[in-house]
């Protein structure tokens, strides 16, 4: 492997900004903000909007927002049904 071309890979704490859930993972991302983890060490903190803790696919709480379809629009326009 060539030296000096690979990014620094280190432990980072990710926090879900909508639920407050935190998890420790390895990443090349870095932050000036740090947080003390359960093991007593301080790690960089990266805030993210969506994680598996808040994403509808993983939580099973999906919201189906469906606009009127073409058939419904046609029926409304011509007074059918």
Curated annotation (Swiss-Prot):
Q: Which GO terms describe its biological process?
A: translation
Coiled coil recorded as keyword: no
Q: Keyword Ribonucleoprotein: yes or no?
A: yes
Q: Which UniProt keywords apply?
A: Ribonucleoprotein, Ribosomal protein
Provide GO CC annotations from the record: ribonucleoprotein complex; ribosome
One GO MF term: structural constituent of ribosome
Q: Which family is this sequence assigned to?
A: Belongs to the bacterial ribosomal protein bL31 family. Type B subfamily.
Q: Cite the HAMAP family for this sequence.
A: Ribosomal_bL31_2
Q: How does it assemble?
A: Part of the 50S ribosomal subunit.
Q: List, alphabetically, the PANTHER family matched.
A: 50S RIBOSOMAL PROTEIN L31, CHLOROPLASTIC, LARGE RIBOSOMAL SUBUNIT PROTEIN BL31C
Descriptive protein name: Large ribosomal subunit protein bL31B
């Amino acid at each position: 492997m060539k030296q000096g071309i690979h990014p620094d890979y280190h432990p980072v704490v990710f926090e879900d900004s909508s639920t407050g859930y935190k998890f420790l993972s390895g990443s090349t991302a870095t932050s000036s903000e740090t947080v003390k983890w359960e093991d007593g060490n301080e790690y960089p903190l990266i805030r993210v909007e969506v994680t598996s803790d808040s994403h509808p696919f993983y939580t099973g709480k999906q919201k189906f927002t469906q606009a009127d379809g073409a058939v419904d629009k046609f029926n409304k326009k011509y007074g059918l049904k």
